[in-house]
Amino acid sequence: MVEELPSVFLVGPMGAGKTTIGRLLAKQLGRSFVDSDWYIESQTGADIAWIFAKEGEAGFRERETRAIDELTQQPQIVLATGGGAVMAAENREYLKQRGIVIYLNAPVDVQMARTAKDKSRPLLQQPNPRKILQGLYSARDPLYREVAHIIMPTGHTYPRHMVNQLLQQLNSFCISTSVDSEPEKD
């Protein structure tokens, strides 16, 4: 059943493991992996921090929406989105309608541990990053849940084990949706 999967889109906060899990999942599925932030960087020739500095968050979000639109139309990929991709209503629609969305749900403590020394995250280059992460989590968690077909807690197990769990959930999801979509027989 997993061969019949549409594209798989990973959403969640920064530090949730979207890139790590996405790479491993793509390898297991025999698919291409794309990180939307890397895609934006390759399209613009500039890194995310530079785009934020020159165009502000609004400029970056416009680029992100174009990228999400393009990438969600590619067949059978595994896509890791940026943490704020769900803020735009059109991105949420693209994700929900064009593939299976997995929400990697990482508690703020896990996010802090994974992003503490990362200087490439513009939103955290301010005093009190924990407060910023808590605010982002509170604002975005309902949106991640809105688009998610599958919710997977992160930070409590090894990435390879998580991928195995996701493969089982994806297989179950495919079975349940194919049964639901079959016409009823009289």
Curated annotation (Swiss-Prot):
Pathway: Metabolic intermediate biosynthesis; chorismate biosynthesis; chorismate from D-erythrose 4-phosphate and phosphoenolpyruvate: step 5/7. GO terms for molecular function: ATP binding; magnesium ion binding; shikimate kinase activity. Its EC number is 2.7.1.71. It is found in: Cytoplasm. One of its GO terms (cellular component) is cytosol. Signal peptide: none annotated. This is Shikimate kinase. The gene is aroK.
